[in-house]
Amino acid sequence: IGRLVTRAAFNTGKVDIVAINDPFIDLHYMVYMFQYDSTHGKFHGTVKAENGKLVINGKAITIFQERDPANIKWGDAGAEYVVESTGVFTTMEKAGAHLKGGAKKVIISAPSADAPMFVMGVNHEKYNNTLKIVSNASCTTNCLAPLAKVIHDHFGIVEGLMTTVHAITATQKTVDGPSGKLWRDGRGAAQNIIPASTGAAKAVGKVIPELNGKLTGMAFRVPTPNVSVVDLTCRLEKPAKYDEIKKVVKQASEGPLKGILGYTEDQVVSCDFNSDTHSSTFDAGAGIALNDHFVKLISWYDNEFGYSNRVVDLMVHMASKE
């Protein structure tokens, strides 16, 4: 995610990357890893090592190699906003270590047990600049929440269940091995459909308080490298024809949620969303209604790149509140 947030920053030009911390690889390896990506292709631009710095598109970036976040001299490098993307320091206390080195704000690129969570297009307006440490929630919450918000605002969600058919990620195993958490998480990622837990649906209740306790869900990890899809099956308060649902989602995708929630009526498949920058793209042709109160809604997301673009957007939004 760190590499893709960096790509998103350079692609959009919205934020300036001034420093990167990675204790595990040297500078020349960073050049290689940033330049080549098996999923998203080669970086369209220049990247090289020069005078101990990583130089991307002519911009020199300071490199730190600290294992302890408290030792990173962010302030010296001029870094004000830190993206904590290790997946390890996800609590207020642990992520707060970055502030000791001179950072002003920390954005955790994962769900957090105690940091306030923000989803662009859903509850980002609730951010205020007294908050120093925030979470951008998970990629799945970023897919589900914008859709749930539109549906709830127009028709009311009584209750719902979410399933995400999710691409493999770095936490999984290439072949069977021991897992730190659930046993089946350790089974070979390329060979299996693996039922897994996800806090994404419950987290929607944190970013849309009216939906608290009304949604829960689970995941199936499937052997694809990237792009996932959310299935939201929910009971509606107000009766709605499926065509009405399509209409309001399309309107939202062209209006307040433009760039965050997409809409398509094409016969798409997962690969069509590789490197897509939306948080969520509603698949109008894939959803079904049992009746006017009970519907299954389908939305695609590039779980890597869409999310990384929202991290950048959240940073920009936070900076606008300074």
From Swiss-Prot:
Residue positions, PTM Phosphotyrosine: 29
Residue positions, PTM Deamidated asparagine: 51, 57, 136, 142, 212, 303
Matches recorded under InterPro entries: GlycerAld/Erythrose_P_DH, GlycerAld_3-P_DH_AS, GlycerAld_3-P_DH_cat, GlycerAld_3-P_DH_NAD(P)-bd, Glyceraldehyde-3-P_DH_1, NAD(P)-bd_dom_sf
Cysteine persulfide, modified sites: 139
GO molecular function term, any single one: microtubule binding
Residues with S-nitrosocysteine modification: 139, 234
Site (Activates thiol group during catalysis): 166
Residue(s) of cross-link: Glycyl lysine isopeptide (Lys-Gly) (interchain with G-Cter in SUMO2): 173
EC number: 1.2.1.12, 2.6.99.-
Transport recorded as keyword: no
Active-site residue list: 139 (nucleophile)
S-(2-succinyl)cysteine sites (modified residues): 139, 234
GO cellular component, one term: cytoplasm
Catalytic activity: D-glyceraldehyde 3-phosphate + phosphate + NAD(+) = (2R)-3-phospho-glyceroyl phosphate + NADH + H(+); S-nitroso-L-cysteinyl-[GAPDH] + L-cysteinyl-[protein] = L-cysteinyl-[GAPDH] + S-nitroso-L-cysteinyl-[protein]
CDD domains found in the cross-reference section: GAPDH_I_C, GAPDH_I_N
GO biological process: glucose metabolic process; glycolytic process; innate immune response; microtubule cytoskeleton organization; neuron apoptotic process; peptidyl-cysteine S-trans-nitrosylation; positive regulation of canonical NF-kappaB signal transduction; positive regulation of type I interferon production
UniProt entry keywords in alphabetical sequence: Acetylation, ADP-ribosylation, Apoptosis, Cytoplasm, Cytoskeleton, Glycolysis, Immunity, Innate immunity, Isopeptide bond, Methylation, NAD, Nucleus, Oxidoreductase, Phosphoprotein, S-nitrosylation, Transferase, Translation regulation, Ubl conjugation
Main location: cytoplasm
Residues with N6-acetyllysine modification: 48, 181, 206, 214, 241
Subunit structure: Homotetramer. Interacts with TPPP; the interaction is direct. Interacts (when S-nitrosylated) with SIAH1; leading to nuclear translocation. Interacts with RILPL1/GOSPEL, leading to prevent the interaction between GAPDH and SIAH1 and prevent nuclear translocation. Interacts with CHP1; the interaction increases the binding of CHP1 with microtubules. Associates with microtubules. Interacts with EIF1AD, USP25, PRKCI and WARS1. Interacts with phosphorylated RPL13A; inhibited by oxidatively-modified low-densitity lipoprotein (LDL(ox)). Component of the GAIT complex.
Function per UniProt: Has both glyceraldehyde-3-phosphate dehydrogenase and nitrosylase activities, thereby playing a role in glycolysis and nuclear functions, respectively. Glyceraldehyde-3-phosphate dehydrogenase is a key enzyme in glycolysis that catalyzes the first step of the pathway by converting D-glyceraldehyde 3-phosphate (G3P) into 3-phospho-D-glyceroyl phosphate. Modulates the organization and assembly of the cytoskeleton. Facilitates the CHP1-dependent microtubule and membrane associations through its ability to stimulate the binding of CHP1 to microtubules.
Annotated protein name in UniProt: Glyceraldehyde-3-phosphate dehydrogenase
Taxonomic classification: Eukaryota, Metazoa, Chordata, Craniata, Vertebrata
